Curated annotation (Swiss-Prot):
SUPFAM superfamilies: PLP-dependent transferases. It is found in: Mitochondrion. The modification N6-(pyridoxal phosphate)lysine is found at residue 350. It is an enzyme of class 2 (transferase). The modification N6-succinyllysine is found at residues 71, 262, 304, 417, 420. This is Alanine--glyoxylate aminotransferase 2, mitochondrial. Its EC number is 2.6.1.44, 2.6.1.40, 2.6.1.18. Belongs to the class-III pyridoxal-phosphate-dependent aminotransferase family. Homotetramer. GO terms for biological process: glyoxylate catabolic process; L-alanine catabolic process, by transamination; N(omega),N(omega)-dimethyl-L-arginine catabolic process. Residues 1-41 form a transit peptide. It comes from the Eukaryota.
Length: 514
């Protein structure tokens, strides 16, 4: 290879690709057919960092049989990334292995869930010990682990957030938080941002404001959307707005301690309060950083003023920490702390159990009592001994291995490296995030900020997978790549991931030029 592209590829230390991937095989033949990555248009890939783990030999269903069963017996709503879905077999720390033994760097961690690494030995050991001791009792009988875990978790939250309700998923946690807010306030209306994702239950669908999750059926009575203070796509935003090492390319004349964008978005929030809800409201839900919408950050100071306005109307403020909690943002253990606010209710899931089904709602004694006066709340599996054993081990690993600090250091390192790609490639419109919660928004061009067509984003996504990197998708048009690896990720692994992404962008530009 000669010319500018050859020089660029050589500078990335790229080498011939030896990874093999499955050819699209929805014809369901008796065996899977295989093709080299050169059939995908890829000729080179960055060198993977070493891994001192050998996966077990895959001995389960044939790939073609998996596709057949999926088509016949699993709901069609169970969709997968890529035309030839990965059949994953084993995990080790940051790595995943498919049924052919191919290795992938997991930079999405099961949708921001595997917080301390796949099959962490301490978490595994805790689960194995409890498996031989006691699986389930329900909350009508006491067991020590739920009490030990509640004490550990509440110690990580500021006063007066000290009462813990354990459930099984983020949707369940937000469902319960909605009940608490309405029981405590004696009001109905709850506000959430456009672009918010708070769950897919019939109740939380009212809070979720992403079109693909909406149905033409009654749901979420009393839920009111409000403008998301999105400083990249919204009407206001500039170069000092975000709490991030990387700012938007939009320019502004604001002084560093003054944000006109924040003031304008607060006026929109006031307008919602004045026109769209009752004089007394039940509450306001907010993710500290929007996840499903593509890692959207708000102007600094916005949530603090919004919380004050909600409380003036008698509402409670709920922080949805399902994706942002447990040290992922680096500078603080909880996302709400990065906004200098104190919520009345905090919901959490995903990283709480490193992939084990577990979630929690933490609130104040007064709000907890309000629910008790209204109803008997019961959850069969919430707080079961297995979940509490796993959850306790996860908290211990985060502390012992300094994973919050690692999120800050390695996340900042990655953001700054990705920002250089934004400056280099016209189709990389924005790089944003904090710690190990990062978004890369793909655009037609930086001036229009219009989303890159889905088929082009799909191809870049697929090319990354072909080179051994798994990343997520988000945004209203699926135009944003979401990066949220386990918090034990290292700088050499970041270097590999950034080189892969850059190579995928180069491949895309070569295709465009043909």
């Amino acid at each position: 290879m000669t010319g500018a592209w050859g020089h660029l590829l050589r500078s990335l230390h790229l080498k011939t690709l030896s990874l093999w991937i499955p050819k699209t095989c929805f014809s369901l033949k008796a065996r899977a057919f295989w093709t080299s990555v050169t059939r995908c248009g890829l000729h080179t890939k960055p060198s993977m960092p070493p891994c001192d783990f050998t996966p077990e030999r895959y001995q389960s269903l044939a790939y073609s049989r998996v596709l057949e069963i999926h088509k016949q017996h699993l709901s069609p709503v169970h969709t997968a990334y890529f035309p030839e879905p990965l059949l994953l077999h084993q995990g080790h720390v940051e790595w995943l292995f498919d049924h052919e033994g191919n290795r992938y760097l997991d930079f999405f961690s099961g949708i921001v869930t595997v917080s301390v690494g796949h099959c962490h030995p301490k978490v595994n050991a805790a689960a194995q010990r409890q498996l031989g001791r006691l699986w389930h009792t329900s909350s009508v009988f006491f067991h020590p682990l739920i009490h030990e875990y509640a004490e550990k978790l509440s110690a990580l939250l500021p006063e007066p957030l000290k009462v813990v309700f354990l459930v099984n998923s983020g949707s369940e946690a937000n469902d319960l938080a909605m009940l608490m807010a309405r029981a405590h306030s004696n009001s109905t209306d709850i506000i959430s941002f456009r672009g918010a994702y708070h769950g897919c239950s019939p109740y939380t669908l009212g809070l979720t404001n992403v079109g693909i999750y909406k149905m033409d059926l009654p749901h979420g009575m009393g839920c009111q959307p409000t403008m998301c203070p999105d400083i990249f796509h919204g009407p206001w935003g500039g170069s000092h707005c975000r709490d991030s090492p990387v700012q938007t390319i939009r320019k502004c004349s604001c002084a560093p301690d003054c944000c006109q964008a924040k003031d304008q978005y607060i006026e929109q929030f006031k307008d919602t309060l004045s026109t769209s809800v009752a004089k007394s409201i039940a509450g306001f839900f907010a993710e500290p950083i929007q996840g499903v919408n593509g890692v959207v950050q708000y102007p600094k100071g916005f949530l603090k003023e919004a919380f004050e306005l909600v409380r003036e109307r008698g509402g409670v403020c709920i922080a949805d920490e399902v994706q942002t909690g447990f040290g992922r943002l680096g500078s603080h253990f909880w996302g709400f702390q990065t906004h200098d606010v104190l919520p009345d209710i905090v919901t959490m899931a995903k990283g709480i159990g490193n992939g084990f089904p577990m979630a929690a709602v933490v609130t104040t004694p007064d709000i907890a009592k309000s629910l008790t006066k209204r109803m008997l709340h019961f959850n069969t599996f919430g707080g079961n001994p297995m979940a509490c054993a796993v959850g306790s081990a996860v908290l211990e690993v985060i502390k012992e291995e300094n994973l919050q600090e690692n999120s800050q250091e390695v996340g900042t390192y990655m953001l700054l490296k990705l920002a250089k790609l934004r400056d280099e490639f016209e189709i990389v419109g924005d790089v944003r995030g904090k710690g190990l919660m990062i978004g890369i928004e793909m655009v037609k061009d930086k001036e229009s900020r219009q989303p890159l067509p889905r088929e082009e984003v799909n191809q870049i996504h697929h090319d990354c997978k072909c080179m051994g990197l798994l990343i997520g998708r988000g945004g209203l048009f699926s135009q944003t790549f979401r990066i949220a690896p386990s918090m034990c990720i290292t700088k050499p692994e970041v270097d590999f991931a950034v080189e892969v992404f850059r190579s995928a962008l180069i491949q895309h530009m070569e295709r465009r030029a043909k």
